[in-house]
Amino acid sequence: MLILGVMNLRNELINETELRKALSIVQNGLFEIRALKKNPKRTLSGYFRDVDTAVNALMSDKIDLRGFNVYMSLNEITPECYDRSQKDRMIIPEVTTNDDVITSYKWLFVDLDPVRPTDLSTTDAQLGKAKSMAKRILAYLKGIGFEDPVVAMSGNGIHLLYRIALVNNSDNEALIQKCLQALSLMFSDDDVKVDTA
């Protein structure tokens, strides 16, 4: 899932224009937006078919997203998910997206995380190292035939999103996992790790 940030949208930590742009780039039809909070533990979820409805739900005065990590699904999910109770709104869900409702993989998600103690934000120096690694990975993958990715900054690292089109099955899931493991073996170091989860 693509992280949209830790935010309170009404306090403008994330600009509405930038939120619209991010959602427009990666949304694939039906998508889920999920918001997680550690203390106290709480989850909100919404299913959306269009950017305007999603942005309106996130900007609503009816929800307070202070302290939440907000992210969206990247893979294609079954249309039946839209019939869930959180259709076109952010609420405490009974159920959220899991592997069983993913029909296909639309993005290879390369997540670069600086090594740091848990619950500490990334420093500018650590983020610089993640950006440097992202450039090396981008050059390597371009050299073997990948198109340019969508590049985004997460709350504490860098995301590289490569367009793919793979049916969700065990072989393709293993292929993606092996790809991430290979990138980790080639590029992870003491300062920045390629997330293989």
List PLM regions with ranges.
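Signature for HUH/AEP ssDNA processing cores
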Residues: 2-156, 163-188
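C-terminal polymerase-core module
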Residues: 192-197
